[in-house]
Amino acid sequence: MLYLCMRFKFDIEKSRILKNDPRRKISFVEVQKIWNHYHYVDCRSDDPEQFRAIGWVKGKLHTVIFEIREDSEGEYYHLVTLWKSTKQEEKLYEKHT
């Protein structure tokens, strides 16, 4: 059996702000669970190269913007921002998963 270890990095202060934002109410720590289940990923922008992941966390669809970066230990996901998915993003998720 093969186990993949995904690494995530993010700004801890920004994560706290997102958790306390009444429109979001979720932190970067919690939203990492998107990668544990079916999720949809596409490229959001090329400069800088950023990706969008859409998936379920805490009973709601959420969208996370992230970058794939490297350090001395290898590749990791740098989480940039997150929000509750829009209607358009919900349709994308339904179409592709």
List each language-model region with its residue ranges.
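Ribonuclease/tRNase effector modules and their secretory precursors
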Residues: 1-97
